[in-house]
Amino acid sequence: SAGHIIGSAQIYLEYKGEVVIISGDYKRRKDATCAPFEVKKCHTFITEATFGLPIFTHPEDKQEAKKIIKSMENNKEYCHLIGVYALGKCQRLITILRELGFNDIIYLHGALMKISEYYKERKINLGIIKNISELRTNEYAGKLILCPPSSLSDRWSQKFRNVIKGFVSGWMSIKQRVKQKNIELPIVISDHADWNE
């Protein structure tokens, strides 16, 4: 396993006693949604380098997820609209929030539902998740709603009033990206290895 997302894998090649491993996307951090990264002895390791610079030292995942919970506690009249990638990041964020004791219903954009149901079928505990279409506009206050990042700035998101927009990505450690995307609640959680990993 590469520990990146569910089903991720490394490529292991052996020829005449020489072993080469090609990591593909990977991370070394604990993740309840996928098998952990497998360390294998090799002569050559070909790594991804999405965050392969010293400036990318990601904070602890649970500390970042706590920012969402704290913001919700401090801003009960607002809905929290959080951008997450549909495969992996959505489900990982949900499991981290559940581990932190957040047991409220988490509402999902329709584009996130099918993949999340797949994770649930694989016995990954996401708690209660529902499609956002089950809520009326006047019921958004105080709710946590996850959506694809592109939805944060398209017509779909215009129906939300009193909203705090967040985005969960390793790229949220770059202040210019946060500003460009008009994100109020940047959450630095990545499915890729950082510099120290």
Language-model-detected regions and their locations in the chain:
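A short secondary-structure junction signal
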Residues: 32-34, 56-59, 92-96, 118-119, ...
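Hydrophobic/aromatic beta-strand patches that form the interior of the parallel beta-sheet core
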Residues: 21, 43-46, 107, 146, ...
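Hard-cation-handling environments
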Residues: 65-78, 84-142, 146-147
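His/Asp/Glu-rich metal-coordinating catalytic cores
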Residues: 1-88, 99-100
